[in-house]
Amino acid sequence: MVLNHLGLDISKTDMCDYLEKGSVGHTDPKEKFIGDPTDSNSYGCYSPVIVKAANKYLESKSSEYKAKDISGKKLDDLFSYIDDGKPVMVWGTVDCKDGSYTVSWTVNGKTVKWYSPEHCMVLVGYDDNNVWVADPMHGDVRSYKKSTFSDRYDKLGKQAVIIEK
């Protein structure tokens, strides 16, 4: 969605070809997408995987844009990017539902806990009480109460990605 916003013509399914993929129980979501992104039963991935895939695509098109991981910022700190016309990819939950850790596994001696229903969206607007996100799963823009969305964003590790020159 963000790449299309910047005038780059790529579909969600074509973008999936740029993702590194791994399997449940053997993969760290910070390193690879867990499962097959075209399968609704797959898990997902976190910001470093998206940055790597986006940059791989951008380099293949000789684009001057670069994906940048800006994770760790409070939700309110992302609004300056929106003010500058830069949509921000953010992690939260499907339909802003409350979530929980549903499964865990060990990769290279480190425990990976999966928070579900994890979902990546694009933050496109805000006001004092609400945020608006472009949701690739639904294909539209949705509004959520800012405090609830901030809670979900925090629970997913305050992950955020921008694409800029």
Describe the function of each predicted region.
Residues 89-91:
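Structural motif
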Residues 1-86, 165:
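Cysteine-nucleophile protease catalytic domains, especially the papain-like/related folds used
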